[in-house]
């Protein structure tokens, strides 16, 4: 009876194979064989030797303990004996790489460190039965404390997840199972974003169960295996040493690939039709004719991938794609050896297709880039938001976006750059301001030309603001050889650098122990100016019973119209908006005296605000209010105030 086995080691012209019954056999080596490959082992091909050879195999097994452990992991994945109740496997790559096993409720049932850094991170912490999102948040916090995550830059966390094969097969509705799993991953991303702020950007990707098997075979995380496959797709021959030793972001930067490139495709099947799979997927030799040449190379074909693929089932190839191995160097012809040459026509100029991933997009919740909200990598600038919004955290009106990075032309010639935006736009290429239409407008095309050289990367920056109603933004190019098109992600490379600081709501407050704003006692952030201290003054040990306060920061409005600002106070008060003094009554006023001043303001912009108040020993009281045609009179809320 033929067996299924995994190649443990190759020695000379022979391969040592461990079969499903955990026995070791030797078979003749064939082209394409490599360690870790699953093959058919016909009995008539097993090399029969005397007993001492079998003993030698046992000795060899001791010398290849690491490989044997890897094979045991494969057996655990491929056999029905793996842990019960497992819903999904999740690999997390920060710099440490960790493997989580979770149940249907999203609780951690096991956590395995995949490298030494990960072992150090989880030391002394109990994660079992903790919800996965909570466990990951805890790991991120530990990583921050240990300096693994730098809070002064963007840190990507790659979360690669595979639905358990048994769970998927037992589900009555596979489509529903996949949908629920995707919703689970979306929830993880949202939880981490909410808990960790904008310095940590979680990226989740769902892959077939076979990715877990291949990752185990190669002793890497699913995320790293995904990176390997992506780079191989674009022609990068990444070594196993690089894959294991470098951080994922270092690998991607080295080869000019953006993080978002990993998420453009839906991974519903392995990139190649013939990859190692479980015993339950083995194709019968009765159904697949096997010639003597490829008898040892027939491999299992996935028939139960978690996601439904529209592609036809793959047929086993004669020479399956090996796992992570270097491509052989071509052997030159021997000296004097006659070689035939065929004349070839003069090739056309080479088109320099890039390996970019898009531009860095900084999104702001107003029109003048002062209320930073989040950053992401946009594959290209081709947006038609209509009367919607780029993100739930951004209002549908009065927002702005700044895209930065580099652009790589395919040809050396004069390029025309086009913008189509509703509303304002500015475009710089190679430091030159090509388009400057910073005004509210319906969707309008503008263009300008500049000479560029093929293969050279030029700085590019596009700024855009949305005023009200419809919103759209597009960036295109054309040249003599380049037809007009949206600039593709392959020719765009995102910039890097620290994130803009997010605004803190409220106003910066300075408290003084006199009425002249000289004896500063302390500073703090006040949510709003709405105080009734009475005789319980905020400043103690006053020289003459007087104190004063200065509030400074920024203010924005919801509407574009004239606003009236009101102060209700029992001391002196002054108010500046946009450096204009609109209220000036610096004297001791009666109880709850009201003053007001007016100024025209535009929605979506921040204006400087300064308020000064002094108390002359009377019960202390001050409020800052506003009103307009559409704004009811109220205390200016914290959400419209921003501390310096």
From Swiss-Prot:
Topology within the bilayer: Single-pass membrane protein
GO cellular component, one term: plasma membrane
Disulfide bond entries: none
Gene behind the chain: rsgI3
Compositionally skewed regions (Polar residues) per UniProt: 302-328
Cytoplasmic side: 1-56
Coiled coil feature spans: none
Gene3D superfamilies reported in the protein's UniProt record: Toxin - Anthrax Protective Antigen,domain 1
The RsgI N-terminal anti-sigma domain, residue ranges: 3-50
Residues in PA14 domain copies: 354-491, 502-640
Physiological role: Anti-sigma factor for SigI3. Negatively regulates SigI3 activity through direct interaction. Binding of the polysaccharide substrate to the extracellular C-terminal sensing domain of RsgI3 may induce a conformational change in its N-terminal cytoplasmic region, leading to the release and activation of SigI3.
Source taxon at top rank: Bacteria
Protein name stated in the entry: Anti-sigma-I factor RsgI3
């Amino acid at each position: 009876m033929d067996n299924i086995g995994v190649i443990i080691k190759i020695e000379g012209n022979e391969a040592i194979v461990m079969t499903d019954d955990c026995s070791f056999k030797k078979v003749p080596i064939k082209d394409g064989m490599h360690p870790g490959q699953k093959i058919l082992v016909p009995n008539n091909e097993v090399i029969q030797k005397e007993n001492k050879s079998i003993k030698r195999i046992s000795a060899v097994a001791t010398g290849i303990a690491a490989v044997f452990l890897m094979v045991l992991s494969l057996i655990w994945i491929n056999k029905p004996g793996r842990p019960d109740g497992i819903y999904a496997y999740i690999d997390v790559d920060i710099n440490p790489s960790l493997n989580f096993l979770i149940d249907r409720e999203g609780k951690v049932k096991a956590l395995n460190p995949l490298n030494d850094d990960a072992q150090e991170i989880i030391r002394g912490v109990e994660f079992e039965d903790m919800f996965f999102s909570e466990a990951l948040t805890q790991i991120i916090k530990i990583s921050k404390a240990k300096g693994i995550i730098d809070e002064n830059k963007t840190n990507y966390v790659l979360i690669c997840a595979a639905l358990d094969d048994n769970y998927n097969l037992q589900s009555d509705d596979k489509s529903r199972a996949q949908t629920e799993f995707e919703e689970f991953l979306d929830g993880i991303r949202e939880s981490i974003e909410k808990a960790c702020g904008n310095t940590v950007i979680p990226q989740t990707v769902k892959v077939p169960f076979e990715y877990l098997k291949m990752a185990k075979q190669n002793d890497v995380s699913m995320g790293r295996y995904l990176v390997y496959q992506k780079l191989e797709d674009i022609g990068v021959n990444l070594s196993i040493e690089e894959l294991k030793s470098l951080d994922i972001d270092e690998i991607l930067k080295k080869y000019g690939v953006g993080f978002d490139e990993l998420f453009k495709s839906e991974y519903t099947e392995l990139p190649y039709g013939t990859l190692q799979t479980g015993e339950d997927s083995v194709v019968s030799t009765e159904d697949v004719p096997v010639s003597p040449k490829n008898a040892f190379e027939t491999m299992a074909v996935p028939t139960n991938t978690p996601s439904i693929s529209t592609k036809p089932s793959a047929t086993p190839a004669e020479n399956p794609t090996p796992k992570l191995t270097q491509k052989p160097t071509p052997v030159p012809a021997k000296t004097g050896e006659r070689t035939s040459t065929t004349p070839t026509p003069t090739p056309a100029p080479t088109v320099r297709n890039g390996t970019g991933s898009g531009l860095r997009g900084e999104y702001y919740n107003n029109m003048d880039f002062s209320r930073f909200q989040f950053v992401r990598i946009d594959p290209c600038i081709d947006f038609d938001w209509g009367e919607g919004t780029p993100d739930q955290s951004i209002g549908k009106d009065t927002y702005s976006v700044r895209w930065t990075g580099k652009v790589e032309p395919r040809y050396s010639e004069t390029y025309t750059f086009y913008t189509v935006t509703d509303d304002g736009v500015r475009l710089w290429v190679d430091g030159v301001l090509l388009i400057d239409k910073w005004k509210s407008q319906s969707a309008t095309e503008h263009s300008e030309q500049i000479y560029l050289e093929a293969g050279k990367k030029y700085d590019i920056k596009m700024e855009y603001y949305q005023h009200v109603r419809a919103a759209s933004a597009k960036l295109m190019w054309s040249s003599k050889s380049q037809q007009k098109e949206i600039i593709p992600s392959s020719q765009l490379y995102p910039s890097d650098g620290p994130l803009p600081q997010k605004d803190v709501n409220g106003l910066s407050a300075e408290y003084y122990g006199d009425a002249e704003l000289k004896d500063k006692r302390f500073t703090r952030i006040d949510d709003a100016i709405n105080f009734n201290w009475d005789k319980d003054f905020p400043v103690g040990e006053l020289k003459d019973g007087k104190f004063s306060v200065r509030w400074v920061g920024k203010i924005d409005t919801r509407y574009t119209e004239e606003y009236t600002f009101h102060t209700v106070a029992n001391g002196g008060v002054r108010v500046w908006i946009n450096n204009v003094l609109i209220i000036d009554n610096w004297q001791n006023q009666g109880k709850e005296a009201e003053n007001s001043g007016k100024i025209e303001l535009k929605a979506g912009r921040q204006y400087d605000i300064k308020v000064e108040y002094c108390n002359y020993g009377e019960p202390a009281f001050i409020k800052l209010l506003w009103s307009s045609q559409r704004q009811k009179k109220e205390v200016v809320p914290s959400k419209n105030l921003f501390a310096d």
